[in-house]
Amino acid sequence: MSFGLHPWDVAFRPSPPHNLEKKVVPPGADREKSLPSPKEDSDGAREPDSTVDLRKKNKKKKNYQRYAKPPYSYLAMISLVIQNSPEKRLKLSQILQDISSLFPFFKGNYQGWKDSIRHNLSSNDCFRKVLKDPLKPQAKGNYWTVDVTRIPPDALKLQNTAVTRQDLFPLDLAPYILHGQPYRSLERLSANHTRGRTTPRMEPEVQIPVSDPAVSFPMILWNLPTSYSKCVAPNVVAPPSIHPLLLYSNFPSISIYNYLPPPYGSPVYSDRRDLLASGLHPQIPLTPKPPELKNAPSDFPPNKTVFDIPVYTGHPGFLASQSLFSPHLPTATPPLVGYRPSGL
């Protein structure tokens, strides 16, 4: 007896094509499957969440910066804030608040110093508790006072720490605790200390005396450097752009071209000088120059005697200027007449 295949039999169903059975696997999937998850160790066991969170907390860095601890004992700081209060008594919360406002070290997240304050209040006999309600001695909100006669003298002095070398803290708190002097906060002390170091001292202004032009100009003429001077500045080789006489605005208006020769013996420059002088001061006639100087070619080389100024004694301009400067010119020094340096 043979049994036929029915449509619901497994053998009767045709097998699907092979390309539909394959799944598309991206590259690197086998590698990712082989790697353990971050919460699993090498053995495949899953780590607890508390261990992972602990590692994350340890990796985080502290972003706050703590100030240096004040170089005083807790006894001294408690006595300081109590004595600076108007009523000479404070609650525990007020003591903690005043100490944190005076010293920035206690403003951070560090809370261990509050236990030290409580311990010093209860262990030192110089601090006395004033009950807010005598019927409730165990109630909170009591006041604390300080008996200054029971404070050890050494407890108020500056302790030897690394902050002591910065000179920001007083050496002794006794004047502020025993005599009632006001104590400034550390921020003000550091600001004043920094300002005292960085602010420069103002030097008193030195007033330069202003001399008379009529007196100072002859001295300028006699003290001009020459090529034969011992010390000549590097910028005296070139001719000056302005004559020293023109630096004085209040000087009498006498043309310097009437009695000073040009720096170079050029005939073109000499003719222009004569035209300029005659146009400016027609009332002063020009006289001919001495022949020994007029015909001398190139008496003043550019690199030698730029400031060597000869004076014409017979020129009217020189006579006019001599009448102005005669009280100031030295009498022992003769005028330079046709001076010509030797060796040229």
From Swiss-Prot:
Highly expressed in the animal cap (prospective ectoderm) and prospective mesoderm of stage 10.25 embryos. Transmembrane segments: none annotated. The gene is fast3. It comes from Xenopus laevis (African clawed frog). Keywords: Activator, Developmental protein, DNA-binding, Gastrulation, Nucleus, Transcription, Transcription regulation. It holds the Pfam family Forkhead. InterPro entries: Activin_resp_transcr_regulator (IPR052327), FH_FOXH1 (IPR047511), Fork_head_dom (IPR001766), TF_fork_head_CS_2 (IPR030456), WH-like_DNA-bd_sf (IPR036388), WH_DNA-bd_sf (IPR036390). This is Forkhead activin signal transducer 3. A motif (Fast/FoxH1 motif 1 (FM1)) lies at residues 224-228. ARF2 contains 2 smad2s, 1 smad4 and 1 fast3 protein. Interacts with the MH2 domain of smad2. The ARF1 and ARF2 complexes are activated by distinct TGFbeta family members; formation of ARF2 is promoted by derriere and vegt.
